[in-house]
């Protein structure tokens, strides 16, 4: 399954003027992997790029019904502090996902890293939106590279 699985990592803050372009590039990258035989797409369920990636997978699922959206969530309380609108979007994605996995029960200091490592450890490709050489996305991209996972940075 790992050889047919792609994960995503990207920044939470996405410039509003770039969302459509980022969505289109993400969709294009996913479709390229589908054509190579990828079926499983793991998304971390965060705001920003994760949300864009989830919607891109769901849109492509209309044309490629065999693909699967797998939400890999860091904890049950991930949405604490989110706006009602963001929670509703999250719940919509969660409802449409083919599978939901939690890597921790409760929020802890390291639960986001644990979720990111789980995504990478179960994938052979990673589509990223990395524009800064710092933070969780930077860590996850470097972790993926160290594990021999193919990284496709749509920000390049």
Across the structure, where does each feature detected by a protein language model lie?
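Acidic/glycine-enriched connector segments
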Residues: 1-156
